[in-house]
Amino acid sequence: SGPVKLPEGTIRFSMTRRCLDPILRNNAASLYALERDVRLIEFHSKANALTDESMEVVRAAAEDHGRGIVVHNDAQHFSAGVDLNGFLSLIRAKDWGGIDAFLVRFESSVKALRDAPVPVIAAPSGLTLGGGFEIVMHADKVIAHANTVMGLVETSVGVVPGGGGVKETFARWHRATGDWRKAAWNTWMQVGYGQTGTSPELSARYQYFLPERDQSVMNRDKLLSLALAEVDRMNDAGYAPASAYEFERPGGDLQEEMAAFMDKGIADGLFFPHDKTVAMAVAGIVTEASPVGVAATEDELFERERRAFVALAKTPETEARIASLLENGTVLRN
């Protein structure tokens, strides 16, 4: 039958990889140097669940960045998020410091990626959810396969995005609307509901895919060559990393409105008590319980995400949700 021949302009990384030695490799991920001194981060754990080892490779790429970084893999799903088995073990051991430390490392990894002095291109396909999507959100540009499903789904297991997902969604909605109150409400709603876009075009309604910046591609085998070309294009144009976003967390009656929305949902039988606990934890990241809004830095929002995550991890309801998903494959409503 001979070797598989792919059309011009198409590359399948699983074929390219056979001729390459990784710069760094562990059980979860590998870092490669491709032609023209571009780095490629490949996740390859089970279901591409993210662990500390995955993030170690992300940080290594940000340091040894060459002329650009591409985050891409050939698996059916880019990454469905952080490894929940690891979290459940930490919760059962009541190792809150361990959870906090994991989130600190995760945050520092996505920040290092975003602040790298070279272009960072994410080229996902399939499920790109939770922590997997948080990595994509910190890239300069997304070149996504048309089947990519994007979203922050953490609330379904009783936690909040803890790697900049809330922060980044909030910034994007503010860029789109120029209104912090609207940005806070939209972020709260879609993170609270764990909404996903089942294609790049549908993800655009959540600001998860930015049509004016990002690209959707029908042929999966073109993702890598397009990403490599984009690194060249950005470098030729004189690349500089984006500066940190300055935030405002709106005050007034916004938190009360959010609480009332949840209470009505519970009364109508749409929500369960723990849904409100989780929703108000998200609210606490993007709003302030004071008459006026307050300025906030990106680092403060990261810290609020992390605190909210750890506080929820301490609740028996969240432990039950994570256990239900891992042990029965069902999303527990409690």
What kind of region is each of these model predictions?
Residues 1-70, 172-199, 205, 211-334:
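Intrinsically disordered, low-complexity segments enriched in small/flexible residues
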Residues 40-42, 55-97, 104-123, 145-149, ...:
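A structural preference for short, pocket-lining loop segments at secondary-structure junctions
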Residues 139-162, 207-223:
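Gly/Pro- and small hydrophobic-enriched strand-loop and loop-to-helix capping segments
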Residues 48-50, 76-81, 128-132, 151-152, ...:
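Flexible loop/turn segments at secondary-structure boundaries
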Residues 111-157, 191:
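Glycine-rich beta-to-alpha active-site loop
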Residues 49, 90-104, 123-130, 156-160, ...:
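Alpha-helix capping and helix-loop boundary segments enriched in small/acidic/polar residues
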Residues 123, 146, 156, 163-180:
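Active-site-adjacent scaffolding segments
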